[in-house]
A protein has these predicted regions:
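Conserved short "hinge" loops at termini or chain/domain junctions
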Residues: 1-99, 126, 133-150
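Elongated alpha-helical scaffolds
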Residues: 105-113, 117
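Mixed-charge, glycine-accented linear interaction segment located at domain edges/termini
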Residues: 117-126
């Protein structure tokens, strides 16, 4: 990597709350199946090992999220207190970034994208799946918009 390329990257450290993301994921699930009876909802999903699935997909989706915003993960540290420290290298004007807002949007993205991946093996309806896809896209657009601000 040449020096000009290195100068375009900035380091950003963000602390994400895994429990908050898990709660957001469950809220997304409630939204997707809102108004359905228990028989109509994809209950196979509820019978899955959600905490286990969440842990695996969460770490995968962190990498996906970072590549989508034009950066890469330098370091991830999952602490016992439920926080994940992510040190990112991203290409963006970093001066005016609202860290609280971008953290919330990242949590939104991770919650919706992890849930979307959980839905793939179960019998969710096309509408439910499209709702999750649109919510992940909306969160990612918001992240990119925040990072693009000078």
């Amino acid at each position: 990597m040449n020096m000009n390329t290195m100068e375009n990257y900035r380091t950003m450290t963000i602390m994400l709350d895994r429990e908050q993301i898990y709660r957001a994921m469950m809220a997304e699930y409630a939204l997707v199946v809102a108004g359905k009876s228990e028989e109509e909802a994809p209950m196979q999903y509820a019978k899955c090992d959600l905490p286990g699935i969440f842990k695996v997909l969460y770490n995968e989706e962190l990498g996906v999220m970072c590549s989508k915003i034009g950066g890469y993960i330098e370091h991830i540290d999952d602490s016992a207190d439920g926080l994940t420290e992510i040190r990112l290298r991203i290409t963006a004007g970093m001066a005016a970034i609202n860290y609280a807002l971008i953290r919330r949007r990242m949590e939104d993205y991770l919650a919706a994208s992890v849930l979307m991946r959980c839905f793939v093996p179960v019998r969710s309806t096309r509408r439910e799946y499209e709702l999750l896809v649109s919510r992940t896209r909306l969160a990612m657009r918001s992240i990119r918009h925040i990072l693009a601000r000078e």
